[in-house]
Amino acid sequence: MLAKLFGLSKKQQSASVAKERLQIIVAHQRSELHPRSSKISSHLLAELKDEIIEVVKKYVALSEENIRDIDLKVEDSSKNSTIEVNIPFN
């Protein structure tokens, strides 16, 4: 009824709903990168760290101490998010 009042067709309504849902999904996916946002994001960062370690080990010898000291930091700005990785090695 409101759609008829404001002149919106069903197609326009569904497009609007789809756009809103997509915006929610994108915001949720972006928030998963932030370590304080949820337990899932901590898990994501842990997986990322493990994969980075495996790649670096192909090219550089890493001791257990080096691996323990690897640091991942997520920084958010108004334009983008960055992940900074510090890997000590001998």
From Swiss-Prot:
A GO BP annotation: regulation of division septum assembly
Protein name per the record: Cell division topological specificity factor
Keywords: Cell cycle, Cell division
Record keyword Cell division present: yes
Keyword Cell division: yes
InterPro entries: MinE, MinE_sf
The family this protein is said to belong to: Belongs to the MinE family.
Top-level taxon of origin: Bacteria
Function of the molecule: Prevents the cell division inhibition by proteins MinC and MinD at internal division sites while permitting inhibition at polar sites. This ensures cell division at the proper site by restricting the formation of a division septum at the midpoint of the long axis of the cell.
Gene3D superfamilies attached to this UniProt entry: Cell division topological specificity factor MinE
